[in-house]
Each structure stands twice: as structure tokens, then as C-alpha cells.
């Protein structure tokens, strides 16, 4: 039987090869065994994002932030999920948080909009 770590590694390998749907299978199994592991939840969020399952991706990134509130990438990724769901103002708040945590990262800065 596969270890949680080997399931996680298999999921990441699928992601690297552009096989996001397959990645979700291994990563969901890993998550079932270790639901509090932020790295598993982040990889799963990325996989769901890549197959346009925005709500599922959002849920994973929210869990990552529950486990690790200062994870700048998770704030950015959550923003991307919200933006894909048409929630631009909410997304903007996440981009601002990500940018505040890691100033000068072009990906984060470029997504911030001025809604004033």
C-alpha cells in the first residue's frame, strides 16, 4: 500500500507532466490520510485550478491559509480562484495581502487593481 508521501509525490509528478486531473486522484487520497498537511492541500488547489474547478481550488487554498496564514503564495492563488469566479474585489484583497507579505514579486503586484 502507498504511503501518504508517495501519493503526494505521485500527485506532484502528474502536475509537472500537465496531468492535473490525474493529480487530483493521488492528492485526494493523500489529503484523506493527512488533511492538515498544507503542502498536500496546496498541490491539490493547484491541480483543481488547472482543471478549472475554481470552488474546489478555492477551498484548498482557504485551508492552506487556515494552516499557514502567512503563506503569500496561498493568498495569491486564492485571489486567482476568486477572480476566476468573478469576485474581483475579494481577489484584490488577497493580492494585496500576498504583495504585503512578499513585496516586489511581480506576479502579485501586477494583479492588484485600483477600485477607488
Located regions from the model:
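TPR/TPR-like (Sel1-like) alpha-helical repeat modules
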Residues: 80-107, 113
Amino acid at each position: 500500500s502507498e504511503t501518504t508521501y508517495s501519493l503526494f509525490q505521485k500527485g506532484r509528478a502528474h502536475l509537472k507532466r500537465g496531468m492535473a486531473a490525474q493529480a487530483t486522484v493521488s492528492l485526494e487520497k493523500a489529503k484523506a490520510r493527512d488533511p492538515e498537511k498544507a503542502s498536500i492541500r496546496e498541490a491539490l488547489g493547484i491541480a483543481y485550478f488547472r482543471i478549472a474547478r475554481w470552488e474546489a481550488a478555492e477551498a484548498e487554498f482557504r485551508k492552506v491559509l487556515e494552516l499557514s496564514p502567512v503563506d503569500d503564495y496561498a493568498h495569491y492563488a486564492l485571489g486567482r480562484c476568486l477572480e476566476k469566479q468573478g469576485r474581483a474585489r475579494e481577489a484584490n484583497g488577497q493580492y494585496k495581502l500576498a504583495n504585503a507579505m512578499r513585496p516586489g514579486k511581480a506576479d502579485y503586484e501586477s494583479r492588484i487593481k485600483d477600485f477607488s
